[in-house]
Amino acid sequence: MAIKLIAIDMDGTLLLPDHTISPAVKNAIAAARARGVNVVLTTGRPYAGVHNYLKELHMEQPGDYCITYNGALVQKAADGSTVAQTALSYDDYRFLEKLSREVGSHFHALDRTTLYTANRDISYYTVHESFVATIPLVFCEAEKMDPNTQFLKVMMIDEPAILDQAIARIPQEVKEKYTVLKSAPYFLEILDKRVNKGTGVKSLADVLGIKPEEIMAIGDQENDIAMIEYAGVGVAMDNAIPSVKEVANFVTKSNLEDGVAFAIEKYVLN
């Protein structure tokens, strides 16, 4: 069955290590779109961290979408308006912020516009996230946070060895209550239980009237597994972690070797 929707992760997949898109990948995406295929960037980033890439790819037209916050938000690409949203509550935030201190990890939380930290010793990785995602960073003590805030995701962030120790201390019931997954060796993302990239892709596919077997999803990290499993054609990058390769139908080339372009040429353009 012909592919009608391509869901592409950004960091480690679409993007080179310097956060740019290669000419070959741009050309392959443009060629797929010229054939009427929907292409959607599917990322843990907020809209602010996606918008410039949408412009670069000419993917901010009416009928273009993006999936942000690992599936918590499906948005119209042109203006960021909401198509579907599932957020964590203030009570979730307070519980998880306290848990982060108990397990020994730095912590931050994101709503649609802002990255919040209650850590006075702000983590390097929090600053890094603010810079890469181009989202303002605000210090706010947990008890002073507006209880009406809708948190699209919260994150435990730390040096990989410290973070892995913290993850090992998280009670199993917490891992069952929320979606808990790694997006990088130094990022653990925690979302509403109903949220992952797979449910985000499904929400958009339902809007567009596209079946799972008409979808190709491409990724490299643990947070990409759900959409790779959901899609009819699940593609792992050659630089993907082993668990992603295990669930994929195909392993393409690495992001340094235009792996996204190679997969699009194989499954869409041929």
From Swiss-Prot:
SUPFAM superfamilies according to UniProt: HAD-like
GTP-binding found in the keyword field: no
Gene3D superfamilies to which the protein is assigned, alphabetical: 3.30.1240.10, HAD superfamily/HAD-like
Cofactor note text: Magnesium. Can also use other divalent metal cations as manganese, cobalt or zinc.
Names of the cofactor(s): Mg(2+); Mn(2+); Co(2+); Zn(2+)
Signal peptide from the UniProt entry: none
GO molecular function, one term: magnesium ion binding
Keyword flag Hydrolase: yes
UniProt: Mg(2+) binding residues: 9, 11, 220
CDD domains: HAD_Pase
Family designation: Belongs to the HAD-like hydrolase superfamily. Cof family.
Record note on quaternary structure: Homodimer.
Name the record gives this protein: Sugar phosphatase YidA
